[in-house]
Amino acid sequence: MEFLPKKIDDYACLHSQEENQVLKDLNRETWAKVLIPRMLSGHLQGRTLSMFSKMIKPKNILEIGTYTGYSAICLCEGLEENGKLHTIDINEELKEISSKYFKKAN
């Protein structure tokens, strides 16, 4: 997150839950293969989305802008049992990456 001072960002990341392996791999692949990787939600934003989702326990989530799927995977961590996430994106070229990681995340 580039909009926070580095010391605050470092502190928040240090005291946040670690990325699971699927998210680490997705993060790495996005930065290695995608043209504008900074659009990825990333570790701190992902943990924040996960926390909100776990607090609310939504039955349904609509995400507009899938990108490579990082934020969608984080949001799913708090879904109610049998809940559903609907995510849409205009860029079909990224669907292969997001679909692969959605399957890995289960």
Question: Language-model segments: what does each one mean?
Answer:
Residues M1-N106:
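A short alpha-helical cap/connector motif
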